[in-house]
A protein has these predicted regions:
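Short, low-complexity disordered leader/linker segments with a strong preference
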Residues: 1-49, 80, 397
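Beta-alpha junction/loop-to-helix N-cap segments that form part of ligand/metal-binding clefts
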Residues: 27, 62-69, 81-151, 219-222, ...
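Extracytoplasmic "Venus flytrap"
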Residues: 42-44, 48-72, 94-100, 122-123, ...
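Hydrophobic alpha-helical segments within soluble ligand-binding/sensing domains
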Residues: 103, 160-183, 196-198, 224-228, ...
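An alpha-beta-alpha
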Residues: 157-218, 241
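Extracellular/periplasmic bilobed ligand-binding domains
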Residues: 200-293
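Extracellular/periplasmic periplasmic-binding protein-like sensory domains
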Residues: 255-326, 387, 393-395
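Segments of small-molecule ligand-sensing domains
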Residues: 313-322, 333-393
């Protein structure tokens, strides 16, 4: 009973904040509780059908699981509160294993299900592949976390998270404005659009912030277990901060190997770092003082209703990716209500209505207040940073 009260309270809070113009889950394919709550999926034209695509299995599985859970939580709340424009919402999530080809297969599966809107994909490479399909089909797409520039290349596509260039630029600005360091070493994944895109914009902005990049060392996804060379060069360069625009799995290895080398600079990452405290066998003390740019923290006061509801539903703390997805669902709801769409409309007509409405809404969400979107699909919201202290995230000023 407690979970239901918290869930409905959060739904009411989020519903009031919307303004238009003024358990862990199973791996693999998921037809979620958002559908089960209706007793039946519903015939086409009677319910809105939102699809999701992302990794549930594989190295990036934590991200996809978080997005699936955050989406389900929001949709269940919306359905309990009466749906969107009086219609219930069905949700179907497909596992892409962080693979572009499998993401296309997942997209085709969702098309066969008669998906009308896509909240996905979760990671950049699959998102770049899928956005070409949604653009050709004129199907509305909102990615919660696809941060590569090309992830929203069509006029039908938007994102909740910051783009890679925005993250790199904002990271350099934050480090410079808060005088965290002057000499920067970068360790990045040159095989990842996410990592290399952030690095590129960071390097471009660094001189404007009085920062000197003294080392820039690459690795690839095929060689991501031994970082001795990269760490030695960073240490020899005299860097007082190491910027890690990478995912948390590699970051956890880097922190351990840096400690083994008695190398203790300030470490700073981006949203892909979220999840490092959940790595199996990782000594959380090695992350003490780690900073990362992220618009969401489980310890932030304004997030507590969501965090409680998420813990009650899934038994774990939400990652930022869950918050991105949750905000994405409520953004779709706000745009759908602004556009007054109904599920009996064609997918193309729904897309045309939503892509106009997305530029006219403003929402207060978990990842930002007064969030709004440009016609290019980019979110407008203020960046935040957190620091890990005593095994927990703390918001920084």
């Amino acid at each position: 009973m407690k979970k239901r009260v918290v869930s409905l309270g959060l739904a009411a809070m989020m519903a009031m904040s919307m303004t238009a113009c003024g358990g862990s889950g199973n791996a693999g394919t998921s037809e979620s509780a958002a559908e089960d709550a209706q007793g039946a999926e519903g015939a086409d034209g009677e319910v809105f059908k939102i699809g999701g695509i992302g990794p549930i299995t594989g190295a990036a599985g934590a991200y996809g699981e978080a997005v699936k859970n955050g989406t389900e939580l929001a949709i269940n709340e919306i359905n309990e509160a009466g749906g969107i424009n009086g219609y219930q919402v069905a949700f179907n999530f497909q596992d892409d294993e962080n693979d572009p080809e499998k993401a296309i297969n997942a997209y085709n599966t969702l098309k066969d299900w008669n998906m009308q809107m896509l909240l996905g994909t979760v990671t950049s490479k699959p998102c770049i592949a899928v956005v070409a399909e949604t653009t050709a089909d004129n199907l509305f797409q909102l990615t919660p976390s696809g941060s590569a520039v090309e992830s929203i290349s069509g006029d039908n596509s938007f994102r909740v998270c910051y783009s890679d260039p925005d993250q790199g630029r904002a990271s350099a600005q934050y480090i410079g404005e808060h005088k965290l360091a002057t000499k920067i070493a970068i360790i990045y994944d040159s095989s990842s659009e996410y990592s290399d895109g952030i690095r590129e914009s960071f390097v471009a902005e660094a001189p404007n912030q009085g920062l000197e990049v003294v080392a820039s060392e690459a690795f690839t996804s095929d060689n991501n277990t031994d970082f001795s060379v990269q760490l030695d060069k960073a240490k020899e360069s005299g860097a007082d901060l190491v910027f890690l625009p990478i995912y948390y799995q590699e970051a956890s290895v880097i922190l351990k190997q840096a400690n083994d080398k008695d190398f203790h600079p300030q470490f700073f990452g981006c949203d892909g770092m979220d999840g490092i405290l959940s790595v199996d066998g990782f000594d959380k003390s090695l992350a003490e003082g780690l900073m990362l740019l992220t618009p969401f923290s489980v310890d932030e006061e304004s997030s507590q209703d969501f965090v409680t509801a998420y813990r009650d539903a899934y038994g774990i703390d939400p990652l930022q990716f869950a918050a991105d997805a949750y905000d994405g669902v409520y953004a779709i709801k706000a745009a759908a209500e602004k556009a007054e769409i109904t599920p009996d409309m064609s997918t193309s007509d729904i897309c045309d209505a939503l892509k106009t409405a997305m530029t006219e809404i403003q929402i207060d969400g978990l990842t930002g207040t007064e969030m709004h979107w440009t016609a290019e699909g980019e979110p407008q919201k203020a960046p935040k940073a957190v620091e890990i202290k005593d095994g927990k995230y703390e918001m920084m000023q």
